[in-house]
Amino acid sequence: MASTVANILKTISDKKALALFETIALTKPNTDILIAKTQLTRKQYYSRMSGLMRSGLVKRKNGRYTLTAFGKVIDDIQRTIKKVINEYYWKLKAIDSFEVADGGLSKEEHNKVLDTLIDNEKIKKVILANIS
């Protein structure tokens, strides 16, 4: 399977496959430990593991599963996504609502709101780059 964005996202969009992927990233376990920790049936386990390996995210080395270099990068990206969802989702929704209300905010007001709500410079940079 070619590692396209759609294939990678499809592979880790399954909750059980993502749990398996995250467990491998944290512990480098063997098969029995993975099945126990993720509470998957053997069939579910092998099906998800096959997808993770075909996508180039996971490899088996000396009887243990580990992330590939590509898998480590994808793991870091998915952790960033999780952090943005957990910490910034509602703040970003609030910023969107200010932009819609009363014809929007001036650039100065927008920057003030952004500085107040968002402490992550990378997120601020992304938002500011897309202001029309």
Where do the language-model regions lie?
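A short acidic, leucine-rich amphipathic alpha-helix
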Residues: T31-K37
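A short, conserved structural fragment
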Residues: M53-R64
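Short alpha-helical segments that sit at the start of domains
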Residues: M1-A19, S106, V113-L114
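Conserved segment of winged-helix/HTH DNA-binding domains
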Residues: A69-E99
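Exposed, interaction-prone assembly regions rather than primary DNA-binding/catalytic cores
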Residues: K91-S132
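Basic amphipathic alpha-helical segments that dock to polyanions
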Residues: L34, Y45-S55
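Pre-recognition alpha-helix immediately N-terminal to the DNA-recognition helix
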Residues: L18-E22, V73
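Short capping segments at the starts of secondary-structure elements
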Residues: K15, L26-N30
